[in-house]
Amino acid sequence: MKILVTGFNPFGSEKINPALEAVKLLPSEINGAEVRWVEIPTVFYKSSEVLEAEILRYQPDAVLCIGQAGGRTGLTPERVAINQDDARIPDNEGNQPIDTPIRIDGASAYFSSLPIKAMVQAIKKQGLPAVVSNSAGTFVCNHLMYQALYLVDKKFPNMRAGFMHIPYMMEQVVNKPNTAGMSLCDIVRGIEVAIEAIVDYKDKDLQLVGGETH
């Protein structure tokens, strides 16, 4: 089994991105699966162009995209990506689409094809906080998740794909009072065991409570 893991470069006012720093430290084999990582630009459309090129080159069985969600307290596998860009800030090339469909011929939304609840359980068993997220936002993270699942729908039907947000690294919150952070070591370990779950749960997810009341 081959798994492609992606990590965004820094964006906004941040000098580092924990997603990229973490994926760089992943071992080349996890739970018997071959793992490769690729850096993704935090740029609408260019991000998915880089992803598709790497999919064509590597031919992975699964794609796990990783992104920073500053303020979140744990690792959060995303349930769904929506067909809408609505950028609060410009991307790294100054693009700021507002209320713009990502793909005219795509679905209104795509659900992750990764075992998100098994991933959450695996992370929590390591003593790390994790929960299913029901919104990937409307910035480049949601854009890339949507594009990955669009590619599954239109071009790579045997591939699985999904997205997981991670918190800030501790050094990013030194001057951000009351903002959660996590050590890079713990972030890497959380991603590793999430990948273990992706390998173990190829056909169906665990049936565990992961919903919200609001």
Curated annotation (Swiss-Prot):
It is found in: Cytoplasm. The gene is pcp. This is Pyrrolidone-carboxylate peptidase. GO terms for biological process: proteolysis. One of its GO terms (molecular function) is pyroglutamyl-peptidase activity. It catalyses: Release of an N-terminal pyroglutamyl group from a polypeptide, the second amino acid generally not being Pro. InterPro entries: Peptidase_C15, Peptidase_C15-like, Peptidase_C15-like_sf, PGP-I_bact-type, PGPEP1_Cys_AS, PGPEP1_Glu_AS. Signal peptide: none annotated. Removes 5-oxoproline from various penultimate amino acid residues except L-proline.
